[in-house]
From Swiss-Prot:
It comes from the Eukaryota. NDH shuttles electrons from NAD(P)H:plastoquinone, via FMN and iron-sulfur (Fe-S) centers, to quinones in the photosynthetic chain and possibly in a chloroplast respiratory chain. The immediate electron acceptor for the enzyme in this species is believed to be plastoquinone. Couples the redox reaction to proton translocation, and thus conserves the redox energy in a proton gradient. It is found in: Plastid, Chloroplast thylakoid membrane. InterPro entries: NADH_UbQ_OxRdtase_chlpt_su5_C, NADHpl_OxRdtase_5_subgr, ND/Mrp_TM, NU5C-like, Proton_antipo_N. It catalyses: a plastoquinone + NADH + (n+1) H(+)(in) = a plastoquinol + NAD(+) + n H(+)(out); a plastoquinone + NADPH + (n+1) H(+)(in) = a plastoquinol + NADP(+) + n H(+)(out). It is a multi-pass membrane protein. GO terms for cellular component: chloroplast thylakoid membrane. One of its GO terms (molecular function) is NADH dehydrogenase (ubiquinone) activity. GO terms for biological process: ATP synthesis coupled electron transport; electron transport coupled proton transport. Keywords: Chloroplast, Membrane, NAD, NADP, Plastid, Plastoquinone, Quinone, Thylakoid, Translocase, Transmembrane, Transmembrane helix, Transport. The gene is ndhF. This is NAD(P)H-quinone oxidoreductase subunit 5, chloroplastic. The lineage of its organism: Eukaryota, Viridiplantae, Streptophyta, Embryophyta, Tracheophyta. The chain crosses the membrane at residues 9-29, 40-60, 89-109, 125-145, 147-167, 185-205, 219-239, 258-278, 290-312, 327-347, 354-374, 396-416, 425-445, 549-569, 608-628, 724-744.
């Protein structure tokens, strides 16, 4: 066992040869490297698979022995400064390593087909491998300096991947927004690291925790300064994990390729903030009020993310706000001191969200058959619907991921979210009410995404956005408002999206959406794609092929069974709670005397309420978004609920307020644009003016004045001796007069 730990330092570096060799190959043998590009995808998967096997071996040893191993090398040693580098293998490291490698491998396999038409294929796999290296280095770091180095590398990789299609202006702006927003948190993290080093004199975790606990117990620190340093450390996690108020970069990050979205939202960038708080939890616990602040940020993010997801039309942005809300649950659990629940939800959410993003990528991939490469169309749920018969495997997989995130048993997220919800009652009834209400909202907006995408009819083939044919029945539109009636039957709303030059309306354009050499050129109306032994020609959305479906099906298995990893049942002496063994010793401020095991009756009693709330949210979503003609064609049921009147008008106003809040991102982006972005730009313009006109103006003015004076003197002198003698005697006379009057 000791020998296995000794070679654990290689974990972060195993994926690194791929980007290095690709770069070397493109420099020395560009043609051969590009022609054999599929080989590099295999190499990436192979090396990351080796890391996964290594991590699983370490995890088994962690479960059996509950031990931690740390190895450090001294780099700088003197009387004042001691800087060490090394690696730390403990339960948190092993959990994160397995999470990163399993999701990373599946995303790489998926990307091989998804990015096959892209000219940036090799560049994509370079970024992905370097991303895996950075994240693995982060989770194995043994001190704050290493954390910060790999933290910045993760940020760089996310910047490169979000702006992968950098020739699209919206993608370029998105990666800049992510980079600048994370700079705020990263600067706070750096200041917090330096502050705690100034207090304790150590960057290494174990020494830092021990020294700081001694200082706190002896009351030898300034609590105001310590709290400030802790808040600065937490600011890094706020930005990285898209917590309020630094969450604004996350939905814009959807401009990158869909596999990147899956990796960022499941196991890398956004998970880094949760990992940092979990790693530093022994430090935060002993600082008054900081845990309350963490839980407050978490509960605000939980509710805000859910409300902002309610009216999103872009399928990836809807999932992005879902990620934001679920990360809020994890942060809430950490703030409550429920360490096990937070990590449990991190695991279950990672696989469920990866499944949803890869499923959405499959849907987008199939929609491009009809609308070409145009994210505003291929990702727009308004134009989807009725995909069940076209992409049945993707539909079933997406449904399982949706139900998991809704908290429906026995799927993965049910077990972890239910644990957090139950713990919230012990911490704060107010927080519990918000958390439980948000569970219902989660079920509503996730079911809404599913229904708009897969149920009904394919809306690009019909006359309006409500997903129905012309019927006399009342229609429920995208937001659940009354569908407007169009008197001219020959006019269709969908024709407003595309008009040909001859004036005739047409949704399908012959134009190829090509963006230099960085995006796929796909708008063929008919594609021949082999999948599962069938070769057909499609004029409708088609099911993805094997290399995209295989990772989705594996993630379905994880979504079905990974929740059983942490089932807290203890019956007849059989302890099924593997996660608690894995995390021993674990921090739990809410159950200090508990062994994390409950009986079936107690568990069912606690679970019934959460499942009821989720079921209510699902029912409301079905009531509003299930196609009217398929559910109530023979019963004019909807009209009985929506007759106009004072109550109806008031409810419409309430829905409009909620819709505007959600669709406009809570006006937070507009607030930042008005008061921060515009203000900073005006300040930069003033600084530029002051620097050029005032700071540079003074020496330039002196030089210019000297030049003109010299020119005047030059013109007056003219090189004649009489002129020189005249000026000489004039200056002497003036000097003598001044001297005379001063001494008079």
């Amino acid at each position: 066992m000791e020998q296995t730990y000794q070679y654990a330092w290689i974990i972060p570096f195993l994926p690194l040869p791929v980007p290095m060799l690709i770069g070397l190959g493109l420099f020395l043998f560009p043609t051969a490297t590009k022609s054999l590009r599929r080989m590099w995808a295999f190499q990436s998967v192979l090396l990351l698979s080796i890391v996964m096997i290594f991590s699983m071996n370490l995890s088994i040893q962690q479960i059996n022995s509950s031990s931690a191993y740390q190895y450090v090398w001294s780099w700088i040693i003197n009387n004042d400064v001691s800087l060490e580098f090394g690696y730390l293998i403990d339960p948190l490291t092993s959990i994160m390593s397995i999470l990163i490698t399993t999701v990373g491998i599946l995303v790489l396999i998926y990307s091989d087909n998804y990015m096959s038409h892209d000219h940036g294929y090799l560049r994509f796999f370079v970024y992905m491998s370097f991303f895996s290296t950075s994240m693995l280095g982060l989770v194995t770091s043994s001190n704050l300096i290493q954390i910060y180095i790999f933290w910045e590398l993760v940020g760089i990789c996310s910047y490169l991947l979000i702006g992968f299609w950098f020739t699209r202006p919206v993608a370029a702006k998105a990666c800049q927004k992510a980079f600048v927003t994370n700079r705020v948190g990263d600067f706070g993290l750096l200041l917090g690291i330096l502050g705690f080093y100034w207090i304790t004199g150590s960057f290494e975790f174990r020494n830092l925790f021990q020294i700081f606990n001694n200082l706190i117990s002896n009351n030898e620190v300034n609590f105001l300064f310590v709290t400030l340093c802790a808040v600065l450390l937490f600011a890094g996690a706020i930005a990285k994990s898209a917590q309020f108020p630094l969450h604004v970069w996350l939905p814009d990050a959807m401009e990158g390729p869909t596999p990147i979205s899956a990796l960022i939202h499941a196991a890398t960038m956004v998970a880094a903030g949760i990992f940092l708080v979990a790693r530093l939890l022994p430090l935060f616990i002993v600082i008054p009020h900081i845990m309350n602040f963490i839980s407050l940020i978490g509960i605000i993010t939980v509710f805000l993310g859910a409300t902002l997801a309610l009216a999103q039309k872009d399928i990836k942005r809807g999932l992005a706000y879902s990620t934001m809300s679920q990360l809020g649950y994890m942060m809430l659990a950490l703030g409550m001191g429920s360490y096990r629940s937070a990590l449990f939800h991190l695991i279950t959410h990672a696989y469920s969200k990866a499944l949803l993003f890869l499923g959405s990528g499959s849907v987008i991939h199939s929609m491009e058959t009809l609308v070409g490469y145009c994210p505003k169309k291929s990702q727009n749920m308004v134009l989807m619907g009725g995909l069940t018969k076209h992409v049945p495997i993707t539909k079933t997989s997406f449904l399982l991921g949706t139900l998991s995130l809704c908290g429906i048993p026995p799927l993965a997220c049910f077990w972890s979210k239910d644990e957090i919800l139950n713990d919230s009652w012990l911490y704060s009834p107010i927080f519990a009410i918000i958390a439980w209400s948000t569970a219902g909202l989660t079920a509503f907006y996730m079911c809404r995404i599913y229904l708009l995408t897969f149920e009904g009819h394919l809306n690009v083939h019909f006359q309006n956005y409500s997903g129905k044919k012309n019927t006399p029945f009342y229609s429920i539109s995208l937001w659940g408002k009354e569908g407007s009636k169009i008197s001219n039957k020959n006019f269709s709303l969908i024709t407003l999206l595309k008009m040909k030059k001859d004036g005739r309306p047409s949704f399908f354009s012959n134009k190829v959406y090509k963006i230099d050499e960085n995006v796929r050129n796909m708008i063929q109306p008919f594609l021949s794609i082999p999948h599962f032994g069938n070769t057909k020609t499609y004029s409708y959305p088609y099911e993805s092929d094997n290399t995209m479906l295989f990772p989705i099906l594996i993630l379905v298995l994880f979504t079905l069974f990974v929740g059983f990893l942490g089932i807290p049942f203890n019956q007849d002496g059989v302890d099924l709670d593997i996660l608690s063994k894995w995390l021993t010793p674990s921090i739990n401020l809410l159950h200090k005397n508990s062994n994390n095991s409950i009986d079936w009756y107690e568990f069912c009693k606690d679970a019934v309420f959460s499942v009821s709330i989720s079921s209510f949210g699902i029912f409301i979503a079905f009531f509003l978004y299930k196609p009217v003609y398929s559910s109530f064609q023979n019963l004019d049921l909807i009209n009985s609920f929506v007759k106009m009147g004072p109550k109806r008008i008031f409810s419409d106003k309430i829905k409009k307020v909620i819709y505007d809040w959600s669709y406009n991102r809570g006006y937070i982006d507009a607030f930042y644009e008005t008061f921060l972005t515009v203000g900073m730009r005006n300040l930069a313009k003033f600084a530029h003016f002051f620097d050029r006109r005032i700071i540079d103006g003074m020496p330039n003015g002196v030089g210019l004045m000297s030049f003109f004076v010299a020119e005047v003197i030059k013109s007056v002198g003219g090189g004649r001796i009489s002129s020189y003698l005249f000026f000489y005697f004039s200056y002497v006379s003036i000097f003598l007069l001044i001297y005379y009057f001063l001494n008079f």
